Amino acid sequence: MSDYRAEFVEFAVASQVLCFGEFKTKAGRLSPYFFNAGLFNDGEKLKRLGEFYAKAIVDSGIAFDVMFGPAYKGIPLAASIVIALAGMGRNVPFAFNRKEAKDHGEGGTVVGAPLQGRVLIVDDVISAGTSVRESVDLIRASDATPAGVVIALDRMERGQGDKSAVQEVREQYDIPVVAVVTLDNLVEFLERDANRRTELQAVANYRENYGV
């Protein structure tokens, strides 16, 4: 895998953001791993996280004009990514939304740069796709165009039907979804460590049942 992808998996494990064991998902499945982006919770981790996202965005070649971080998790993500991109020589405006509209001051639900041109949505993962749907609606209501979505991890896992949430977003909105890492990269990480054979087998079994 690309060097930054391998580094990101190791970074997530070291930060205890990515854990292996037995975890119950919202869908009631027993997953052999858990990804909790909320534990990227200090300055150094957030700085590195933004850099990994920025590398994935540049690597993808996706064209966009504005970065949008949906409340709440997307807000620090968007800020850290545009700072990282600025360090790479690209200055990108960013915006985020409030959960509730403000009726004083600048008002409205969108804070930061105007949503115009091609807008790239950032999130940690795509589960049900609710956050993406709300973001797409908000962007289109501003007469802007959704350019795509960038996430930290693609679990490559079926939802209620035969497709993953990521596949559904790609097809429903006809936009690319860029992931810093996918389940494939997690598997490669486990394969390199002889002490993680049990975890590797658990992931393989889970993937056989729920993978896409």
UniProtKB/Swiss-Prot annotation:
Pathway: Pyrimidine metabolism; UMP biosynthesis via de novo pathway; UMP from orotate: step 1/2. It comes from the Bacteria. InterPro entries: OPRT (IPR023031), Or_phspho_trans_dom (IPR004467), PRibTrfase_dom (IPR000836), PRTase-like (IPR029057). Homodimer. GO terms for cellular component: cytoplasm. Keywords: Glycosyltransferase, Magnesium, Pyrimidine biosynthesis, Transferase. This is Orotate phosphoribosyltransferase. Gene3D superfamilies: 3.40.50.2020. It is an enzyme of class 2 (transferase). CDD domains: PRTases_typeI. The gene is pyrE.
